[in-house]
Swiss-Prot record:
Similarity-based family: Belongs to the urease beta subunit family.
Catalytic reactions of this protein: urea + 2 H2O + H(+) = hydrogencarbonate + 2 NH4(+)
Gene Ontology cellular-component annotations: urease complex
Highest taxon above the source species: Bacteria
Keyword Hydrolase: yes
Root EC class: hydrolase
Protein name per its UniProtKB record: Urease subunit beta
Protein keywords: Cytoplasm, Hydrolase
Organism: Azotobacter vinelandii (strain DJ / ATCC BAA-1303)
GO biological process assignments: urea catabolic process
Oligomeric form and interacting partners: Heterotrimer of UreA (gamma), UreB (beta) and UreC (alpha) subunits. Three heterotrimers associate to form the active enzyme.
Length: 101
């Protein structure tokens, strides 16, 4: 193996198999671009993003790890969210949960 080399298996890989998902319409009401990473608790994103926050509690973007979605000022788009896994405890981010979901 060469350092940094990828050895990719043939076929498809299904991300987040079996987890509940949700599609939301999200609008950037601000005057600056907002980028949200793959594992950010979507409920706690920038307040300039307008969407049903209650539905997004305990969820993150359903995109590959290490990637992000960018919302330009005035832009509205649909995003798919997936429920958080593991112990379902959320600490940090914007400090709106700080414990179990």
């Amino acid at each position: 193996m060469i350092p940094g080399e990828y050895q990719i298996q043939d076929g498809e890989i299904e991300l987040n198999a079996g987890r509940r998902t949700l599609t939301l319409n999200v609008a950037n009401s601000g005057d600056r671009p907002i980028q949200v990473g793959s594992h950010y608790h979507f409920f706690e994103t920038n307040d300039a993003l307008v969407f049903d926050r209650a539905l997004a509690r305990g969820m993150r973007l359903n995109i590959p790890a290490g990637t992000a979605v960018r919302f330009e000022p005035g832009q509205s788009r649909e995003v798919e969210l997936v429920e958080l896994a593991g112990l379902r405890r959320v600490y940090g981010f914007a400090g709106r949960v700080m414990g179990e979901l």
